């Protein structure tokens, strides 16, 4: 099946700054070697000339250094990203991939400011993430400094095993993936008739609701995040549409449809009446919630498919959708 976007996941981190000058937060690093490296740069001052002017900082009151650095929504502007990162630190912005993290990348990669490994290490020493991640970054930056590294692809996500950072790096990765996925969808639908495009838009409104509800309620999130599940569904949608556009359309007999529907219903009833009532983070109630939304989703898909692929019978679409839904259940039932 397929699934889509939604994810308003909390961004967390401990960042403390004064309004005029950077006040480095407490380090979580316990590794002796990394602590020694941090001690060697503790008196390093970040370049005063790199900070925004008062007028610039006022204009940057609602800026996002990540958006400016990576070019989300507009052309990348690393110089403005650098000034924004300082502004974020001054206003105690708690976005995890922002402020210090972006500034560390700017000084390491030499994008938006003169390369400055000592400044990058000083920032890395006080990011306040997982101790292992923080120490790993310090070691990595120290190696790059000794190698006179001249690359531009260092990332805070190079070390992101701590849950919060891992989650935010997954969201960051999805932002890049979305650009590529949307481009492919636009290319795929470019030649569609206006009525087909309109039907697809209507379907996607329901699809997005289902993908969000399914990721929250129908997936065991003990070893994953909602955003990762949504990415799985989104990519699956694109793959399915690409196959359909190649002419690889579902073709089920009446008997195959009956079997698929029976299997889907049996799996669902097992979640409601079987001996188990909980599967990790999934409960009977959460399954009911996702099932209710899936039924709306199935109807929305069939309405779209009736317009776009009129040669495929409704029983074939239902069999295809039922088979996919059974697979969703089996992910946690087996």
Q: What residue spans do the PLM features occupy?
A:
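A broad, structure-centric signal for solvent-exposed, well-ordered loop/edge residues
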Residues: 10-11, 16-17, 120
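Hydrophobic h-region of N-terminal signal peptides that target proteins for export
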Residues: 14-26
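Bacterial N-terminal signal peptides that target proteins for export
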Residues: 2-11
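N-terminal alpha-helical modules
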Residues: 24-334
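Detector for intrinsically disordered, low-structure N-terminal pre-sequences
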Residues: 1-2, 20
């Amino acid at each position: 099946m397929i699934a889509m976007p939604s994810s308003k996941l909390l961004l967390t981190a401990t960042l403390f700054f004064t309004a005029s000058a950077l006040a480095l937060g407490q380090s979580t690093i316990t590794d002796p070697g990394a602590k020694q490296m941090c001690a060697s740069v503790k008196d390093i001052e970040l370049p005063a000339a790199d900070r925004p002017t008062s007028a610039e900082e006022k204009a940057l009151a609602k800026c996002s250094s990540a958006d400016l650095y990576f070019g989300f929504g507009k052309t990348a502007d690393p110089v403005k990203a650098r000034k924004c990162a300082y502004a974020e630190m001054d206003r105690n912005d708690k976005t995890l991939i922002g402020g210090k993290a972006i500034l560390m990348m700017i000084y390491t990669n030499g994008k938006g400011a003169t390369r400055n490994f000592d400044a990058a290490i000083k920032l890395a020493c006080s990011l306040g993430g997982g101790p292992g991640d923080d120490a790993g970054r310090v070691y990595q930056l120290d190696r790059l400094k000794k190698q006179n590294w001249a690359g531009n692809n260092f990332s805070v996500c190079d070390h992101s095993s701590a849950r919060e950072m891992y989650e935010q790096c997954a969201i960051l990765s999805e932002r890049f993936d979305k650009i590529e996925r949307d481009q492919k969808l636009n290319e795929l639908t470019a030649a569609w008739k206006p009525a087909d495009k309109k039907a697809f838009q209507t379907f996607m409104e329901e699809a997005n609701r289902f993908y969000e509800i399914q990721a929250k309620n129908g997936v065991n999130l003990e070893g994953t995040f909602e955003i990762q599940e949504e990415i799985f569904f989104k990519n699956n949608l694109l793959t399915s549409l690409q196959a359909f556009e190649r002419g690889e359309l579902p073709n089920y007999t009446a008997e195959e449809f009956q079997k698929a529907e029976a299997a889907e219903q049996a799996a669902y009833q097992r979640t409601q009446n079987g001996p188990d009532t909980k599967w990790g983070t999934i409960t009977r109630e959460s399954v009911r919630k996702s099932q209710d939304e899936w039924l709306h989703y199935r109807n929305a898909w069939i309405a779209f498919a009736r317009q776009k692929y009129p040669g495929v019978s409704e029983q074939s679409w239902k069999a295809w959708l039922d088979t996919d839904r059974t697979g969703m259940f089996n992910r946690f039932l087996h």
